[in-house]
Amino acid sequence: MRKYLLASISLLTVVTLLAACAPAGEGEADCSDPDVFCVGLVTDVGKIDDKSFNQSTWEGVKQAEKELGAVVQYIETTDSKDYGKNIAQFADAGFDVIVTVGFALGEATLEAGPQYPDVKFIGVDQEQYPGAEVENVVGLIFPEDQSGFLAGALAALMSESGKIGSVCGTDAVPPVWRFGEGYRAGAQYVRPDVEVNIVYHNDVGFDKTFTDPEWGKTTAISMIDKGVDVVFGAGGKTGNGALLGCAEKGVMAIGVDTDQYYTVPEAQSALLTSAMKLLTPGTFDLIKMAMEGNFPQGGNYVGAAGLAPYHDLADRVPAEVDAKVQEIDQAFKDGTLQTGVSPAKPE
């Protein structure tokens, strides 16, 4: 189990409560009942149906409802000041597990841990550092740099112009930094002369950086107009906008977090692959551990990452290109290759 530092930051994200309670006619479940297993989720920036990060994590919670019989609810935060209040809403109601989605909720999650020692907290994308762990808080983290590296290698090998791009949310969020810089490193690893244009949406607040599809689209189109022929969109709805810009202009796109061939069908014609974090199984696995009494004692749980299938563009990917991507992926698994990307943007 790898352990890292939890960087903390305040950020804007959610407050609409939607509940999936007991079956119709039985009334709302009592989560204080020891025989009822309840899981609550507090989202990061964006909505629960963002076709990306929040949605994929929620699907892991829903899997626990289906397979484990858990009672599940979520809260969409609308103001960063409400992080603690939203977490407390679930904890005070007797929820067994609380999933907080995104780097920005890390500080509030760590603060809630000691206040509610009987609750198991899963902090998605919230890295925990040695010496700063809380026993009932586990960070679900992923090797985004490796996934981004694979995406960059593929993009560089597929590019005819020798120019590739990436449209990202803010690089102040370490996983976004690792995706973007991993993409750059992977491209240069397989094609040192490739031109890589990465734009981070650092010019707005955290309430906007991941929820700005228009900016994402116009930024991608601007790149394309300058010769970029593969674009990696990494930043929630902002990144989704970049995918749509690629579809409009007829150039290849790479999605993020989930297999966006399914979550952004409007961009299917352009989607080469997606740099995935397997959020759904990672979330479900930790919930199941909590239910079975095998929840980790603080620290981090490292989920899997990799590329999605090529889907409609599979015929365009030469066998030698796919072989090189697979070779790199295997080298990561064997531990014989490192990305060289720092865990977070250097100060």
Predicted regions mapped to residue ranges:
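Bacterial N-terminal signal peptides that target proteins for export
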Residues: 1-9
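Hydrophobic helical h-region of N-terminal Sec-dependent signal peptides
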Residues: 10-14
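C-terminal motif of bacterial Sec signal peptides marking the signal peptidase cleavage site
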Residues: 16-20
